[in-house]
C-alpha cells in the first residue's frame, strides 16, 4: 500500500530535512520575524499587476527567501480523513467552496468528515470565474464565525478560496481535484474580469496553510488534466534556471535559494522518470507509485520550484497568446505553457539536440509542439507580432531573463519552434499528433492506450 505523503513547513525560512518512514516530510525553522514583518494583518493581500515582483517590500531584496505552505498531504481517500488535518486550524466551523460539478463528485466527502466531528460547515457554490464580482458575492455568504476557508476544485476555485481567506484574515486549505497545474501551493491568486480576461495578480504574505490532495479523486479525472500539469511542470526548471542566471527576483521576493533550485531540478527529473508511466496509470484509473510521484511533481515540486525560482518566457508566451483569437484557447494552461517552454529554449539558443530531446519528450506526453497542434497553423505574421507585444508587456515575467527581446524576435522564435518540431517529426517518423480538443474543458485529448 502506498502511504500518505506529508510535508510540513513554516514559510520563508531555511530548510531542514527530516526522514520519516513511508512519508515525505520537510520542516522549516519558525521565527517571530514573520509577525514583525507583516504586522497584525497576517493574511492581508498585496494586489499588484506585476507577476515577477511580489510587492514593493521585495523588489530590492537580495536575501535568499524560501516560501511554502505549512503542510502538504497527499494520499488515497484522504478526503475521508479531512478532520484529522483540518482540526489544526479549525474545530468548530468551516466554509467549503467548490463548483457544482466538484460538489457532485467529491467535495461532500470533506463535509461529511468535518460534520461527523461536530463542525458546522457552510457549503458555497463557485460560479466559475475568479472575478472580483464573484469573490465579493462569495465573501458575503461566509458566516462571521468562520474559522477556515477550504477550496476544492480547479485553479480558479483555489484562487478564489485563497482570496476570500486572506480578505477575512483566515487560514486557507486548498484541495486540488486535478493535477493540472502548480497553482495550489502558491501565495497568489489570478484575478479575472467577469468575462474571463486576465485582470491582475493578488499576492499574499503567506502561502496556504494546507495543501490536501486525495489521489483517488485525482486518478479518476481525465488524463488530459495530468498531462496539462506535466506541461506546466516541465517549464519550472527551465524558467528557474533562467531567473537564477539573470539574478532576478523570485516570486518569493528575493534571491532563489539552493533548496528552491534543487526542488525545480527534482521536478524535472521526476517527470523524466515517471511521466509516461503515470499517464498510462491515469488512463486505467490506478494509483501507482509513478502516478503518485507525478502528482507530487506537478503540484508540490513545481509549485515550490516556480515560486522560489521564478517565471520567465514560457509563461509570458502563454499570456501573450491571449492576444489572438481562435482554437488556441481550447487548450489548457499547461498545454500552452509547454509550447512556451520550447519558445524559451529557442530564445536562449539551446543546441538543436537539446531542443529535440525536450520536444520529443513533450510529444510522447501528448503535448502540442507545432502551430498546427496549437490550432493556429495559418497564424499570420501580424498575429504573431501581437503575441510578441503582449508577451513583452512591462509586467510580464519574460523580463526576468538576462537577454532582452523585441516582438519580432518573439514571433520568429514561435515560428522556429514549429519548424524545428516538424523537422523532428519528419526525421523520426513520429506520427502521433496532438489532437486539439473540441473545448478547453473537454476530457478528450488523443488516443492513449496502456
Swiss-Prot record:
Is this entry keyworded Oxidoreductase? Answer: yes
> What UniProt keywords apply to this chain's record, in alphabetical order?
Glycerol metabolism, Metal-binding, Mitochondrion, NAD, Oxidoreductase, Zinc
GO BP, one annotated term: aerobic glycerol catabolic process
Protein origin, superkingdom: Eukaryota
Enzyme class comes to oxidoreductase
Does the keyword field hold Metal-binding?
yes
Task: List the molecular function annotations (GO) for this entry.
Answer: glycerol dehydrogenase (NAD+) activity; zinc ion binding
- The residues that hold NAD(+) are 99, 155-159, 177-180, 186, 188, 192
Pfam families reported in the protein's UniProt record = Fe-ADH
Cofactor binding note: Binds 1 zinc ion per subunit.
Q: Which InterPro entries match?
A: ADH_Fe/GldA, ADH_Fe_CS, Glycerol_DH
For binding Zn(2+), which residues are annotated in this chain's numbering?
232, 315, 333
Catalytic reaction list: glycerol + NAD(+) = dihydroxyacetone + NADH + H(+)
Q: Which GO terms describe its cellular component?
A: mitochondrion
Required cofactor(s)? Zn(2+)
Which positions in this protein are listed as binding substrate? 182, 232, 315, 333
Q: In which pathway does it act?
A: Polyol metabolism; glycerol fermentation; glycerone phosphate from glycerol (oxidative route): step 1/2
Induction data: Repressed by glucose.
NCBIfam families, from UniProt? PRK09423.1 (NF006941)
Similarity section: Belongs to the iron-containing alcohol dehydrogenase family.
Query: What role does this protein play?
Result: Glycerol dehydrogenase involved in the assimilation of glycerol.
Name of the protein in question:
Glycerol dehydrogenase 1
Q: Which organism is it from?
A: Schizosaccharomyces pombe (strain 972 / ATCC 24843)
